[in-house]
Curated annotation (Swiss-Prot):
Role description: May be involved in strigolactone signaling pathway. Essential for plant responses to karrikins, a class of butenolide compounds, structurally similar to strigolactones, released from burning vegetation that stimulate seed germination and enhance seedling photomorphogenesis. Mediates a specific perception of karrikin. Required for the establishment of symbiosis with the arbuscular mycorrhizal fungi (AMF) Rhizophagus irregularis and Gigaspora rosea. Karrikin binding induces a conformational change.
Name listed for the protein in its UniProt record: Probable esterase D14L
InterPro entries: AB_hydrolase_1, AB_hydrolase_fold
Domain of life, source organism: Eukaryota
Gene Ontology molecular functions: hydrolase activity
GO cellular component: cytoplasm; nucleus
GO biological process entries: arbuscular mycorrhizal association; response to karrikin
Reported phenotype of the disruption mutant: Loss of responsiveness to and symbiosis with the arbuscular mycorrhizal fungi (AMF) Rhizophagus irregularis and Gigaspora rosea characterized by the absence of physical contact and of characteristic transcriptional responses to fungal signals.
Active site: S96 (nucleophile), D218, H247
Compartments reported by the entry: Nucleus; Cytoplasm
Keyword field contains Nucleus: yes
The species this protein was found in: Oryza sativa subsp. japonica
Tissue-by-tissue expression: Expressed constitutively in all organs (e.g. roots, stems, leaves, panicles and embryos).
Record key words, sorted: Cytoplasm, Hydrolase, Nucleus
Length: 271
């Protein structure tokens, strides 16, 4: 097993002949977040699953704080994974920050991506002049302070807010588990990198077709953000806002989300 495979807990499942699908999870989760989607893909596709560096199941000794201080570090990891597996072209499904990571990777290697399915994606979380990302700087400062002072307590409060449900729901409990599995100092560093990121200037450079999918109600991504992506991406794009709630709809509302994702995976944008 190569260092890339080991570091990212790389798994390839399915023997399908319709091509390769790469599933990339967002902050606070790991590859298990795709458990409701994978069974629908394995008959038709080869499915690549991995954990982003810093996620709970990864070795914290491999987490390089300077490399992952920007999203480009994660994009380089993604390209290394595709190289390791000798993937010539893939359909990439990225959730949350991994949607943006896939978009960044596609700028330097558009040939590797036939399409990007961007679930709950945002190019910037902070509000700005003529831009509504959903957060003010003081909101983020409070979030970082809470993470730093008592990480376990923060997880318990953040999970239901993010997922959109009470602590008793299976999805909230699952997200709480994967969130709490991350080493606290790594979690804080990753959260700071994500929430302070701004990739708006890169969007016109993304020429691969993009399928933008999000919940009607999402604590982290207002619906107007999807319209912003649609307007500023450099290639063809389409937006679908689902009647779901929360930032992890593939976990909390699989009955709504899985059919939508499958449709965007299987059908291209009609030009």
């Amino acid at each position: 097993m190569g260092i890339v495979e080991e570091a990212h807990n790389l798994r390839v499942v399915g023997e399908g002949k319709r091509g390769v699908i790469v599933l990339a999870h967002g902050f606070g989760t790991d590859q298990s977040v795709w458990k409701h989607l994978v069974p629908h893909l394995v008959a038709d596709y080869r499915v690549v699953l991995f954990d982003t560096m810093g996620a709970g199941p990864t070795n914290p000794d491999y987490f390089d704080f300077s490399r992952y201080a920007t999203l480009e570090g994660y994009a380089l990891d993604l390209l290394a994974i595709l190289q390791e597996l000798r993937v010539a072209s893939c359909i990439y499904v990225g959730h949350s920050v991994s949607a943006v990571i896939g978009a960044i990777a596609s700028i330097s290697r558009p040939d590797l991506f036939s399409k990007l399915v961007l679930l709950s994606a945002s190019p910037r979380y902070l509000n700005d002049v003529d831009y509504y990302g959903g957060f003010e700087q003081e909101d983020l400062d409070e979030l970082f302070e809470a993470m730093g002072s008592n990480y376990k307590a923060w997880c318990s409060g953040f999970a239901p807010l993010c997922v959109g449900g009470d602590m008793e729901s299976v999805a909230v409990q699952e997200f709480s588990r994967t969130l709490f599995n991350i080493r606290p100092d790594i979690a804080l560093s990753v959260a700071q990198t994500i929430f302070q990121s701004d990739v708006r200037s890169l969007l016109p450079l993304v020429t691969v077709p993009c399928h933008i999918v999000q919940s009607t109600k999402d604590l982290a991504v207002p619906v107007v953000v999807s319209e912003y992506l649609h307007k500023h991406l450099g290639g063809d794009s389409i937006v679908e806002v689902m009647p779901s709630e929360g930032h992890l709809p593939q976990l909390s509302s699989p009955d709504i989300v899985i059919p939508v994702l499958l449709r965007h995976i299987q059908h291209d944008i009609a030009v």
